């Protein structure tokens, strides 16, 4: 009590105000007594009061302002003035071949710091940045850890010809971001418009992603370790019918509804007879017999009466696990520094059977040596090893899902009474995967080394920089298919497939690149800032792809080419290539008083992929900026921190074509017959004539942008609108006369216009919880684009179908053409009367071309008396109409992060607001038994299918092959409008 009384006697009430440099009171400023948890915050007038001792030091902090330390002393009233923290505007952002301060950037450039990535821990870098940057669309085909992603910047399809995706550079060298260790990343910059990507020329036609890895700091040696264990769960588990009786009844309805006759077998491996069905129904309806799932028929073969076999559950787990370990060592002294990191990641597979496993090892070593005051040498070595073991079925295409859908009937069994495999176990692939002798092994090595030499010719004025990079990649894929024995009766052994086999594909890639540039930053009067950079770049890439294979293992389970007795082959296939790029680039940036900004940049590119007379192209750009917030009429408005307008215009080339498109090539193939113990090689005439003048695709972009920071940088806004004209796209041209025997030649035959916008709105703030600061940030992003074909040399005007893309002038990319459905027939009489009116209709309900109640009724929109697609051309499309668009629209991202008392929390959402989709015929989890009668039976279809008691159902009467036509209809969406 005495001690407490003494402390209270020394404390006193201290009050004060906190204001900005402009004299505006600041609300919510945190005032904390250093070394304690005692503190307070300012009110709406910027005032505060707290108990403090004369020796106490007050820490005053506020978002967007520099923190201050104020000693209490003998004062009881304090006046604190905080100055704005210009770090946000002074932040250094990595751009092409250099860096720039954010305040001076006039191109469309976005940046993500390492701190943001740390708040979104993920084993895969690209998943950590999904939804973070407007205009960046990251697409992954599936969740496999080995799968590379597609990165498109601005527009989902940049070109219908050469195609391509963003150029991804890791410390200036092209690399695979999927294989990168996220812990190594210092920052990520995304260059989106022609102005910011111009120095990369044709290599940056689709935008550029620049990843900078962490560098060593000149400090004592430190060792950091981090590890994690993850549980990875499936996002959606398909809902399908496992009740045998329901599945079988639907199968018979679908099969007979289309073919109008009884089956002889269910998908060619499960025998069907009328006597089998009679017995099966008896067992299903007789409780005393239903447990008997098999018996021997008169020929001594098994008759199966399986019940409720859940094949999907037999194959797939609901979740799996992964673990990773990271270690980093760094340190340095006055003249040198180093950093080395390593990571091991392992993820188990999703199959219950087979030992599916993915492993990845990353290692990086980076060091810098200051040899003299003006000479610095840096070396960066990166190594990645990935291995992926996948159990597979009886075929090398790994179509586990398709096998399961088409052979995994609930009425079948996995094993026979004697423990042998059933035919169903083999045809689904379950037996192969369980035995573990059929698999695909992928092994990939990446080694990359970059050496950089920097010479300060005139300190901070004239800097020369040169680098050389070498990348070596070796990948090997080994497909092993072993025979599995099943039985369809006691003592009967059948091996499947007919022969065991092994196929090996090896790819070796070597990549060399060299860069040299000179940067000049003259010492000018304070109001002026200038930087001029010019450089040279050369790249060479060579790939060799070899395939080999052999059939017939002498010893099962011993996949070795020397232990096989079949015919073997070795060949180098068309995936081998060799190309080179060379470019000369420049950039000049100027700023006047920090508010008037201008930049000129460009590149002169040459590529070996084009004929000698078309190999070179010049791609310039220009951009200007105006920091309106620095004008006198706005400079003193305290709540405005930055308002900057940006405008850019530029042109980029696209050289993403095959290296040999301008050459007349002959394909060599192996004959299908064996002569004198070997397969003969043969060739034929070229399939098409050469393009007359193959040259660069080019894209010209205009961009208008606005950057806004308000309320002490707590509120931020970034917006861009742009138009991109892509010309000379590499597509097929006009059809040649049939007498030539050639298909239409490829060439620069199409143009496309893309218009779009990007906006993001962010809020960053803090307040106190339990006398401790709670920091949080929210960011909302929205972006969209639409592309129109403005020129198409081929005048065939063919319309797209489910399985074939087609284009025409004026077409919006992603258009879906299809038939309209006006409803379902109510009675057989109505259906048959409609069918008799046009015996030449395109759509029929089955092999006998009859219509019944519950069938789809198509609209004869052109009133021709026939429902058809004419010649499937724009000028003769019959009853086809535009019924949707498959292009994703209105991409959005929502990001929220917070931290308090050492606890970090982050959540994000990303998606698209609108997209039409038409499931193709093999989309079994949508179509179910409307596709193949023996496919999945889907509960949501069963609950909303036409019947006499449910005439207003969504789904028509059940019959197979409804989903097989190549032209979509408006009958598969809730609004009766489907996609192709």
Predicted regions and their residues:
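C-terminal beta-signal and adjacent terminal beta-strands/loops
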Residues: 233-234, 315-316, 638-641, 788, ...
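Extracellular/periplasmic, surface-exposed regions of secreted and cell-surface proteins
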Residues: 117, 164-165, 366-385, 393-394, ...
């Amino acid at each position: 009590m005495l001690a407490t009384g003494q402390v209270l006697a020394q404390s006193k009430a201290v009050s004060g105000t906190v204001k900005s440099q402009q004299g505006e009171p600041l609300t919510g400023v945190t005032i904390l007594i250093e070394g304690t948890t005692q503190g307070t915050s300012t009110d709406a007038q910027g005032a505060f009061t707290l108990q403090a001792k004369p020796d106490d030091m007050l820490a005053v902090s506020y978002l967007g302002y520099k923190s201050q330390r104020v000693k209490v002393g003998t004062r009881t009233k304090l006046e604190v003035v905080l100055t704005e923290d210009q770090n946000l505007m002074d932040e250094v952002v990595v751009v092409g071949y250099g860096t720039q301060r954010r305040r001076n950037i006039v191109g469309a450039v976005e940046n993500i710091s390492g701190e943001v990535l740390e708040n979104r821990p993920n084993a895969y870098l690209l998943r950590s940045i999904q939804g973070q940057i407007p205009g960046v669309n990251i697409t992954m085909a599936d969740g496999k850890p080995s799968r590379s992603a597609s990165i498109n910047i601005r527009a989902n399809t940049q070109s219908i010809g050469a195609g391509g995706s963003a150029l991804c550079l890791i410390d200036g060298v092209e690399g695979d971001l999927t294989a990168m260790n996220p812990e190594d990343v210092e920052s990520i910059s995304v260059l989106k418009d022609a102005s910011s990507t111009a120095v990369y020329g044709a290599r940056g036609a689709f935008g550029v992603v620049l990843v900078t890895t962490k560098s060593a700091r000149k400090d004592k040696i430190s060792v950091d370790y981090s590890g994690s264990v993850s549980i990875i769960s499936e996002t959606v588990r398909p809902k399908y019918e496992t009740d045998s009786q329901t599945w079988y009844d639907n199968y018979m309805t679908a099969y007979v509804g289309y073919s109008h006759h009884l089956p002889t077998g269910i998908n060619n491996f499960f025998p069907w007879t009328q006597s089998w069905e009679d017995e099966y129904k008896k067992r299903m309806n007789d409780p005393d017999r239903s447990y008997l799932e098999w018996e021997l028929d008169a020929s001594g073969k098994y008759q199966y009466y399986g019940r409720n076999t859940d094949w999907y559950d037999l194959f797939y787990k609901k979740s799996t696990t992964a673990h990773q370990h990271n270690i980093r060592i760094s340190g340095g002294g006055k003249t040198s520094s180093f950093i080395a990191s390593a990571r091991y990641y392992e993820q188990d597979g999703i199959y219950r059977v087979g030992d599916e496993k993915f492993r990845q090892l990353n290692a990086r070593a980076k060091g810098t040596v200051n040899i003299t005051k003006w000479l610095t040498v840096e070396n960066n070595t990166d190594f990645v090893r990935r291995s992926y073991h996948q159990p597979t079925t009886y075929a090398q295409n790994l179509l586990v899902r398709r096998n399961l859908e088409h052979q995994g009937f609930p009425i079948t069994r996995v094993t026979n009474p004697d423990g042998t495999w059933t035919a169903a176990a083999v045809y689904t692939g379950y037996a192969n995967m369980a035995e573990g002798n059929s698999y695909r092994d992928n092994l990939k090595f990446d080694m990359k080394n970059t050496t950089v030499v920097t010479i300060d010719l005139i300190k901070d004025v004239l800097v020369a920089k040169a680098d050389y990079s070498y990348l070596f990649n070796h990948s090997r894929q080994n497909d092993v298919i072993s025979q599995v024995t099943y039985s369809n009766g006691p003592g009967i052994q059948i091996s499947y497939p007919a022969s065991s086999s092994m196929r090996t594909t090896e790819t070796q890639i070597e990549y060399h690149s060299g860069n040299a540039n000179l940067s000049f930053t003259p010492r000018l009067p304070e109001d002026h800032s200038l930087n001029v950079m010019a450089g040279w770049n050369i790249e060479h890439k060579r790939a060799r792809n070899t395939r080999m294979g052999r059939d017939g293992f002498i010893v099962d389970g011993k996949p070795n080419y020397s232990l096989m007795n079949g015919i073997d082959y070795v060949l180098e296939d068309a995936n081998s290539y060799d190309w080179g790029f060379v470019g000369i680039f420049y950039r000049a940036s100027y700023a006047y008083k920090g508010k008037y900004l201008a930049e000129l940049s460009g590149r002169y590119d040459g590529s070996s992929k084009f004929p000698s007379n078309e190999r070179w192209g010049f791609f310039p750009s220009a951009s200007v900026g105006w920091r309106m917030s620095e004008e006198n009429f706005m400079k003193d408005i305290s709540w405005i921190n930055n308002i900057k307008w940006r405008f850019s215009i530029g042109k980029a080339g696209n050289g993403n074509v095959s290296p040999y498109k301008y050459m007349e090539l002959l394909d060599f193939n192996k004959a299908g017959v064996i002569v004198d113990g070997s397969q003969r090689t043969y060739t034929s005439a070229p399939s098409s004539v050469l393009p007359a003048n193959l040259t660069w695709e080019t894209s010209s972009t205009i961009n208008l942008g606005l950057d806004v920071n308000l309320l002490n940088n707590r509120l931020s806004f970034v917006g861009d609108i742009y138009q991109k004209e892509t010309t000379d796209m590499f597509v097929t041209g006009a059809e040649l006369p049939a007498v030539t025997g050639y298909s239409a030649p490829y060439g620069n035959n199409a143009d496309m216009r893309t218009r779009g916008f990007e906006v993001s709105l962010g809020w960053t703030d803090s307040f106190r919880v339990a006398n401790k600061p709670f920091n949080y940030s929210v960011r909302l992003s929205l972006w969209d684009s639409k592309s129109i074909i403005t020129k198409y040399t081929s005048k065939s005007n063919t319309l797209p179908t489910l399985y074939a893309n087609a284009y025409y002038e004026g077409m919006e990319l992603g258009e879906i053409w299809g038939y309209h459905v006006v409803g379902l027939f109510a009675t057989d009489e109505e259906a048959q009367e409609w069918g008799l009116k046009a015996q030449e209709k395109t759509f029929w309900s089955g092999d006998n071309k009859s219509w019944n109640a519950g069938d789809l009724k198509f609209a004869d929109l052109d009133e021709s008396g026939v429902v058809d697609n004419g010649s499937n051309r724009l000028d003769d499309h019959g009853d086809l109409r535009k019924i949707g668009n498959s292009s994703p629209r209105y991409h959005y991202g929502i990001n929220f992060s917070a931290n308090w008392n050492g606890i970090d929390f982050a959540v994000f959402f990303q998606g698209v607001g609108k997209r039409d989709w038409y499931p193709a015929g093999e989309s079994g989890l949508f179509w179910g038994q409307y596709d193949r009668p023996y496919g999945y039976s889907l509960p949501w279809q069963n609950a909303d299918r036409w019947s006499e008691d449910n005439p207003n159902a969504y789904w028509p009467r059940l019959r197979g092959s409804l989903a097989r036509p190549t032209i979509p209809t408006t009958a598969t969406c809730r609004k009766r409008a489907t996609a192709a």
